[in-house]
Swiss-Prot record:
Alphabetical list of InterPro entries matching this protein: Ribosomal_bL27, Ribosomal_bL27_CS
Family: Belongs to the bacterial ribosomal protein bL27 family.
Protein name, per record: Large ribosomal subunit protein bL27
Pfam families: Ribosomal_L27 (PF01016)
Domain of life according to the entry: Bacteria
GO terms for biological process, alphabetical: translation
UniProt cross-references to Gene3D superfamilies, sorted A to Z: 2.40.50.100
Residue span of region Disordered: 1-21
NCBIfam families: L27
GO cellular component, one term: cytosolic large ribosomal subunit
Disulfide bond annotation, renumbered to this chain: none
Organism annotation: Hydrogenovibrio crunogenus (strain DSM 25203 / XCL-2)
Keywords of this entry: Ribonucleoprotein, Ribosomal protein
Gene Ontology terms, MF aspect: structural constituent of ribosome
Length: 85
């Protein structure tokens, strides 16, 4: 019988680079307009007051101020807002 013993090792061995997702600025932190607050895939966090959403679902500050995470609505959703100075 013919055996291909090591074929699996050539098909494995790939890994993608980390995408550096997550919250970049936490609640209570001061941010400048244009600062990235959350990098995400999908909308785990939603854009609230003074926050914009990029085409890759990144949330960014539209105004300078303090970051706040607010949970509200039905179904419960977490909104990121900026309390402008």
């Amino acid at each position: 019988m013919a055996h291909k013993k090591a074929a699996g090792s050539t098909k494995n061995g790939r890994d993608s680079n980390a995408k550096r997702l997550g919250v970049k600025r936490f609640g209570g932190e001061q941010v400048l307009a244009g600062s990235i607050i959350v990098r995400q895939r999908g909308t785990k966090f939603h854009a609230g007051d003074n926050v914009g959403r990029g085409k890759d679902d990144t949330l960014f500050a539209k105004a300078t101020g303090e970051v706040a995470f607010v949970t509200k609505g039905k179904p419960l959703r977490t909104f990121v807002t900026i309390k402008a100075d």
